[in-house]
Amino acid sequence: MRNILYVQIIFILIIAFVTPIKSYAFNVAKHISNVNGLTNNSVNCILEDEEHTIWIGTWDGLNAYNGREITTFRYSKNNPNSISNNVIRQIIECKGSLWIATDNGVNRLDKRTRQITRYYLRTDNKVPNQEKSFILGKSAAGDIICLIKGLGFFVYNDSEDEFNPINTDFASHVKDYSVSDSDHVLFLLNNGSSVYLSYNLLVNGGKQDDLRTVGIHTPVDKIFLSKGRFILNKDNRIFLLNPDFTVSQDIELDSNKPVSQAILAEDNMFVSFIEGGCINYDLRKNTFTYLNELSNQLS
């Protein structure tokens, strides 16, 4: 199900990237939509790469914005150097390439040559019948792993240029996951439980008995990773975790709207909502303000 239809994308640079918090008085907003060349106004993911190109994954293709123009990448039946599917779910940068999860396969895009390699990871060649069937992760060393719903976890072997299966016994219970810079893997299970183990243990065949429970006693709906910190969400509650997976802050938001994203920036956390709007939560003062620069149609 689509999270939100964007009428326009607004890049508040201090939120999306690394501009200091003290620059709030000088926010710069850039409006981009399909009028400017974006393939679709419904956006699933955004990534700024090392060259500061903005990559935008939509429901109808991948877009690269360099500050002046938009380059688009879309599936073409007659072009093997096109992406495997136009619904872009996730973008990860690693070693000069972008790894792109779509609704039908994973793609590796060489940023220098623009060569695209497709990895379907399915033997039946059928399009998955559920959304977000491919979920990517990256280890601290730059290893790429992928969860394929119904098939399990896979790790990319660069010398063989293929994904090899990881022998685990709990993949069918995983709804979502994320890998931190310290090589801890947080899993959101189908029953709402949140558990974790080390990346090294996962790729070496970690089992369900190896999973450790996060220090909260309520099921959650979403997990986020920002600035090396895990963030969990259930309804209007946000749980910011410590490195040892205990709860650092339990935040109750003054809104019943479903959360779409949570991003850390110094002592602040920016929280956006699926139905539109965004707040800046001060983690030291435990206060928040609404960002009036953002249209209520954006999340």
Model-based region annotation:
Residues 1-299:
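Carboxylate-rich, polar loop motifs that coordinate divalent cations or form catalytic acidic clusters
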